A protein has these predicted regions:
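Histidine/acidic-residue-rich, glycine-tolerant segments that coordinate divalent metal ions
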Residues: 58-59, 80-82, 86-98, 104-105, ...
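Metal-dependent amide/peptide-bond hydrolase catalytic core
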Residues: 211-395
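Non-cysteine beta-strand/loop elements that form the S-adenosyl-L-methionine
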Residues: 74, 83, 186, 345-349
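A structural signal for isolated positions on well-ordered beta-strands in alpha/beta enzyme cores
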Residues: 50, 128-130, 288
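Divalent metal-coordination and catalytic microenvironments
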Residues: 21, 60, 73, 103, ...
Length: 395
């Protein structure tokens, strides 16, 4: 894949911005410094700037010609609450905070594209550059929408992307339909009656009740839904008791549920509640069932996915546009795709041929304390953004 020459010429300066962002990571809705950097750069390049959506979100507006057509390009900007292990010059300077998912690179790619689009304006219409906060659990996309993102900036479609370690630089991957799962959490408090461990018959032990629930939950996946409908119920925490010779009053179970469709999610939530309540009753215990729906599934729209495939094949070559298998990870671009047609795609962050977090042992996976974004990707990702915008708003 060949990057646009003017973007290549700016690659070093944009990479320096990326490393500055990496060194100063900010968590959900705290991205004030990052937003200031983005807004300042956009303004210097003659791009109109709107701030405040989703607290720390930034929207750049690039117009050309007379068309009322518009398209959106989105990058997330927040970091993770992690301690970085890297020791290079641009490692995090904020203890307990790190850009371990590459949002610094996503921001840099969209900034590079913004600079080129503002300089050359080879399109007819409006490009909205959406720099979104709080993707990592904060639902920043939802908050920007609630604050009027699509009312203030009416766009026909919107595209989002994520770097993908292990996939070669210059390769892209996409899938029509469900591609990322919904993310949901549950908490079940089983209440029995405490007793001496030597006299369990005098109490109601909540621990075996909880154990029965954990096993029964897996039969929801294997026996209550269709085998072709993917779902995962993961019990990740069980807490009970404070002393070895005491049967506790309570046992708390917590975990996550992930599905690709809301119908399956509805089924699982209903059946988990039934299993929890009926199992507790069978043992003479009581339970409090809590289920929190976080991110919905990310479902790419067919027409926009086909459009991306066509443009990506022209830019990167058909052999470098891959189909990726759905993942049970979650992404809050899902909220955007509930409101607007669009497509979310992956960009190869390298298969071992880059710095790889400084250890030189191959690419680090996302959310790894030795991860680093591959700067070689910046001009390629920016080129893809530019070509998507120009193709959507072709003169």
């Amino acid at each position: 894949m060949k990057a646009i020459e003017s973007i290549l010429a700016d690659a070093a300066s944009i990479a320096a911005m990326r490393r500055d962002i990496h060194a100063h990571p900010e968590l959900c809705f705290e991205e004030q410094r990052t937003s200031d950097l983005i807004a300042k750069a956009l303004a210097e390049w003659g791009i109109a700037v709107h701030r405040g959506l989703g607290k720390t979100g930034v929207v750049g507006i690039v117009k050309n010609g007379s068309s009322t057509r518009a398209v959106g390009l989105r990058a997330d900007i927040d970091a993770l609450p992690m301690t970085e292990h890297n020791r290079f010059a641009h490692a995090s300077t904020y203890p307990g905070k790190m850009h371990a998912c590459g949002h610094d690179g996503h921001t840099a790619m969209l900034l590079a594209a913004a600079k080129h689009l503002a300089r050359h304006r080879r399109f007819d219409g409006t490009v909205y550059l959406v720099f979104q906060p709080a993707e990592e659990g904060g639902g920043g996309a939802r908050e920007m929408i609630r604050d009027g993102l699509f009312d203030k900036f009416p766009m026909e479609a919107i595209f989002g992307a994520h770097n993908w370690p292990g996939m070669a630089v210059g390769q892209f991957a996409v899938k029509s339909g469900p591609c990322f799962a919904s993310s949901n959490e549950f908490k079940i408090t089983v209440t029995g009656r405490g007793s001496h461990a030597a006299l369990p018959h005098n109490g109601i032990d909540p621990v075996p009740v909880a154990c029965q629930m954990v096993q029964a939950f897996q039969t929801i996946v294997t026996r209550n839904k269709r085998p072709i409908d993917a779902a995962v119920i993961s019990v990740t925490m069980i807490h009970a008791g404070e002393a070895t010779n005491v049967v506790p009053d309570d046992c708390v179970i917590e975990g996550t549920v992930r599905t690709f469709t809301l119908d399956v999610l509805d089924l699982i939530e209903r059946r988990m509640k039934e299993v929890a309540e009926h199992t507790s009753a069978a043992f003479g215990a009581q339970c409090a069932f809590e289920f929190h729906r976080n991110y919905p599934p990310t479902i790419n729209h067919e027409a926009e996915t086909a459009f991306f495939r066509r443009v990506a094949a022209e830019v990167a070559g058909v052999d470098n546009v891959l189909e990726f298998e759905p993942t049970m990870g979650a992404e809050d671009f899902s909220y955007i795709l509930l409101d607007k047609p669009g497509c979310y795609f992956l960009i190869g962050n390298g298969d071992g041929g880059h710095r790889a977090g400084g250890h030189g042992l191959g690419p680090c996976m996302l959310h790894n304390p030795s991860y680093d974004f591959n700067d070689d990707l910046i001009p390629l990702g920016a080129t893809m953004w530019v070509r998507l915008a120009e193709a959507w708003l072709a003169k």
